[in-house]
From Swiss-Prot:
Full protein name: Invertase
Protein species of origin: Wickerhamomyces anomalus
Keyword Glycoprotein: yes
GO CC, one annotated term: extracellular region
Binding site for substrate: 39-42, 60, 103-104, 170-171, 223, 313
EC number(s) on file: 3.2.1.26
UniProt keyword annotation of Metal-binding present: no
Keyword entries, A-Z: Glycoprotein, Glycosidase, Hydrolase, Signal
Amino acid sequence: MIQLSPLLLLPLFSVFNSIADASTEYLRPQIHLTPDQGWMNDPNGMFYDRKDKLWHVYFQHNPDKKSIWATPVTWGHSTSKDLLTWDYHGNALEPENDDEGIFSGSVVVDRNNTSGFFNDSTDPEQRIVAIYTNNAQLQTQEIAYSLDKGYSFIKYDQNPVINVNSSQQRDPKVLWHDESNQWIMVVAKTQEFKVQIYGSPDLKKWDLKSNFTSNGYLGFQYECPGLFKLPIENPLNDTVTSKWVLLLAINPGSPLGGSINEYFIGDFDGTTFHPDDGATRFMDIGKDFYAFQSFDNTEPEDGALGLAWASNWQYANTVPTENWRSSMSLVRNYTLKYVDVNPENYGLTLIQKPVYDTKETRLNETLKTLETINEYEVNDLKLDKSSFVATDFNTERNATGVFEFDLKFTQTDLKMGYSNMTTQFGLYIHSQTVKGSQETLQLVFDTLSTTWYIDRTTQHSFQRNSPVFTERISTYVEKIDTTDQGNVYTLYGVVDRNILELYFNDGSIAMTNTFFFREGKIPTSFEVVCDSEKSFITIDELSVRELARK
């Protein structure tokens, strides 16, 4: 069972009253950030305003209702009090010309006014500086500052701050490095497979420190790098209690096709990132998680928080939504943990857990915008052909299409594997029945191979006519524990209209996938089934909760 870090939770399962009518915009997620209208892709500058207690997300945007990627590309802007309900504020940064773009970048809180852009009239917690790629004839790195808490920006009159005469250097991510007392930028030299590391005292003058080159899974190009320091949940000693993580996005070239994020664990000394090994580790093994970015200026108890674009460049421009395209993933909390990777080895792994509660919402209940409206729980159920779990949130025809499930189960028969025996059980997410038809997402666990199979096949014409949508995906999982009864596994999932986020074994593996039911259908019921005369799975704990806006 996924257990959220202390910062995050009051019941993880608090979350939305009558979410939008299922007959209108039925594919729009309700607890994931989406644009009010137009196109959205990479998350850009993201920060927490500690004074106003407000979360800011900028994103690649074109508000044109055609809802496809096209210039001019702007920075759209949304804010939230609780990371689940978002207010849209239009464009915050725009290019000089309509055939150009303000490409991806980041935002920092320049609390000590190292840039010299601010005076005492601007609160230190609201000294906002954006660092971005200006995409004109070349790609140059530029900066802008805000005097109104991040709602608009003034471009630096001596831009660019970095110009290497390249059309393929972009996506600067900037952070403050205490140990070397300087700003650090990681930026992609995309088609040379380089992450370039720069340092600056003032966000204006930058010196190249080192290059992280040709590491991991290359794909076609590197994009959207990131760098942060994370605590280790279960350190092996008192000496090493944290590690640095460098992140990369690659597109195209994912093993599943299109877009994916990978990460490296190591050390950073203010000049060079030193990876612990050469292994390729993927952040999220689904099809719809790209261009991850972390928040700047989070509270210490909030830890490292971030989100990603929940789509894939293979089909992002053609998904069947109305007047808008794309959503972000849920905000996730990030740590590191030693986990078993197979029966004989263990290693540090990125742990991801969705954020439903922050320091402020724990202190002030009125900030919460979500609640549980229906719930179902079962414990110690021996699953077989005659015993199953079934829930239906559409009995009053007012289902929200948003629910979560939290499952812990034990494989009690470890000697299975004969061809005449069932070795699988399934979790099924059903739509309501419309015009005599129902659609289903399938999550099947095979005990013989300890593998989850996910099938997001629907009858929507978009999916039927999109050969690159990759409807069937699988992942091996190692047991999370062993008891006298058998091997233990966990799975936490969030279903939100057209997006499914899965967190296996307490968040050591994450998988994000979109799906598109047709004819106004939304997810309304959840079922657990095993077609076996003999029980080999015990559901230790299962909770399913339907969520709605207050």
